[in-house]
Amino acid sequence: MTDPENNDQLVKSSDPEHPANLIPELCKKFYTLGWVTGTGGGTSIRRGDHIFIAPSGVQKEMIKSEDIFVLSYPTPKYPPSARQYIRKPRELKPSACTPLFLAAFDRGAGCSIHTHSQWAVLVTLLVEREKGKNGCFEINNIEQIKGIPKGKGKGMLGYFDTLRIPIIENTAFEEDLTESLEQAMDEYPDTYAVLVRRHGIYVWGDTPAKAKTQCESLDYLFQLAVEMHKLGIPWIQ
């Protein structure tokens, strides 16, 4: 059996697009946007039968390729002890987001991103106040909506389409979000994101580039929605 603490060749590559190189670069970018402040958030990329995941509880802007965990895929979500790590950095903790990332990969994603964006948190509070706990985020007639897919193989949303993002309730522990996240995925099969009230958002895409640009588009829309609300401008026309 391969020793997961000595399988360093899995994260050594001169290719800047290799997941072990790309995850640290993405985390640095996300830090500048305020998405992964104070060790929060995370990023994971699937390449073939390997999943690369940023560690938990570390300064995301300081992550290096040697800090990346690698899982064999597919792998069980629960219990954590059953997950098939083929590389585990010493003295670092696996991401608490792991089962939620796995839920996205089980639906065909190539990359999953979790942020603690303030704009994402604020829209969950505004939706709760206006629509109650069962409401979802909805917005239309905004150009940036075109950056979000309609669903798998359905192309992109158009200007006149309505973007809908489900919202789930937060839990005391990250991993406990998994069941409600998967339920939201089932109820909104075309979604590429799930908001977590008072917490942040999970976004996934077919590739790292698509996940990143979708996350950027959503954050733009959330910030715009907060500003529109201040001005009394409705999100739905």
Curated annotation (Swiss-Prot):
The entry's Zn(2+)-binding residues are H114, H116, H199
Q: Which SMART domains does the entry link to?
A: Aldolase_II (SM01007)
* Entry EC number(s): 4.2.1.109
Catalysed reaction, written as an equation: 5-(methylsulfanyl)-D-ribulose 1-phosphate = 5-methylsulfanyl-2,3-dioxopentyl phosphate + H2O
Quote the NCBIfam families the UniProt record gives.
salvage_mtnB
* Keyword entries, A-Z: Amino-acid biosynthesis, Cytoplasm, Lyase, Metal-binding, Methionine biosynthesis, Zinc
* Naturally occurring in which organism (per UniProt): Coccidioides posadasii (strain C735)
Q: Where in the cell is it found?
A: Cytoplasm
Its family?
Belongs to the aldolase class II family. MtnB subfamily.
Q: Which domain of life is it from?
A: Eukaryota
Cofactor(s) required, per the database record: Zn(2+)
Q: In which pathway does it act?
A: Amino-acid biosynthesis; L-methionine biosynthesis via salvage pathway; L-methionine from S-methyl-5-thio-alpha-D-ribose 1-phosphate: step 2/6
Q: What is its main location?
A: cytoplasm
Gene Ontology MF term list: methylthioribulose 1-phosphate dehydratase activity; zinc ion binding
GO biological process terms, semicolon-separated: L-methionine salvage from methylthioadenosine
What function is annotated for this protein?
A: Catalyzes the dehydration of methylthioribulose-1-phosphate (MTRu-1-P) into 2,3-diketo-5-methylthiopentyl-1-phosphate (DK-MTP-1-P).
Descriptive protein name:
Methylthioribulose-1-phosphate dehydratase
What top-tier enzyme class does this entry carry?
lyase
- Enumerate the InterPro entries for this protein: Aldolase_II/adducin_N, Aldolase_II/adducin_N_sf, MethylthioRu-1-P_deHdtase_MtnB, Salvage_MtnB_euk
Give a single Pfam family match. Aldolase_II
> What are the GO cellular component annotations?
cytoplasm
> Which of this chain's residues are annotated to bind substrate?
C97
Active-site residue numbers: E143
